[in-house]
C-alpha cells in the first residue's frame, strides 16, 4: 500500500513538485493502479508467445536525412536563448545522486 511519504519520494525522483494535498490524492490513485497490475499478474500467460508490440508493424518512421536551412540567423534569433551559434537550453540532468 502506497502512503503519502512514498508518493512524495516518487515525485522527488521524477523531479515533480506536488503539494501535500496532491500527495494525499495521488496515494489512492497509485494504489488503484497497483491493484490493477495485481489482477493482470493473475492471468495465465503460459501459452502466450512473447511480443514486443500489439500489432506487427515495423520501421514506420521516416528515414533520417539532413537538410540545409537557408536563414540560419533568423532561426537562431527565434530561440528564447542562444550562446554564440548554439541554442541554450535548460539543464535537465544534474549530479545529485539519490
From Swiss-Prot:
Lineage: Bacteria, Bacillati, Cyanobacteriota, Cyanophyceae, Oscillatoriophycideae
Keyword check for ATP-binding: yes
Name this protein carries in UniProt: Aspartyl/glutamyl-tRNA(Asn/Gln) amidotransferase subunit C
MF term (GO), any: glutaminyl-tRNA synthase (glutamine-hydrolyzing) activity
Highest taxon of the lineage: Bacteria
GO biological process: glutaminyl-tRNAGln biosynthesis via transamidation; regulation of translational fidelity; translation
Family membership: Belongs to the GatC family.
Keywords attached to this entry: ATP-binding, Ligase, Nucleotide-binding, Protein biosynthesis
Catalytic activity: L-glutamyl-tRNA(Gln) + L-glutamine + ATP + H2O = L-glutaminyl-tRNA(Gln) + L-glutamate + ADP + phosphate + H(+); L-aspartyl-tRNA(Asn) + L-glutamine + ATP + H2O = L-asparaginyl-tRNA(Asn) + L-glutamate + ADP + phosphate + 2 H(+)
Function according to Swiss-Prot or TrEMBL: Allows the formation of correctly charged Asn-tRNA(Asn) or Gln-tRNA(Gln) through the transamidation of misacylated Asp-tRNA(Asn) or Glu-tRNA(Gln) in organisms which lack either or both of asparaginyl-tRNA or glutaminyl-tRNA synthetases. The reaction takes place in the presence of glutamine and ATP through an activated phospho-Asp-tRNA(Asn) or phospho-Glu-tRNA(Gln).
Subunit annotation: Heterotrimer of A, B and C subunits.
Enzyme Commission code: 6.3.5.-
Amino acid at each position: 500500500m502506497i502512503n503519502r511519504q512514498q508518493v512524495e519520494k516518487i515525485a522527488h525522483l521524477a523531479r515533480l513538485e506536488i503539494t501535500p494535498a496532491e500527495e494525499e490524492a495521488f496515494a489512492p490513485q497509485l494504489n488503484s493502479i497497483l491493484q490493477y497490475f495485481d489482477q493482470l499478474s493473475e492471468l495465465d500467460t503460459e501459452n502466450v508467445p512473447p511480443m514486443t508490440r500489439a500489432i506487427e508493424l515495423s520501421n514506420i518512421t521516416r528515414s533520417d536525412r539532413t537538410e540545409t536551412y537557408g536563414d540560419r540567423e533568423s532561426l537562431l534569433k527565434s530561440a528564447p536563448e542562444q550562446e554564440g551559434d548554439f541554442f541554450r537550453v535548460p539543464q535537465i540532468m544534474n549530479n545529485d545522486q539519490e
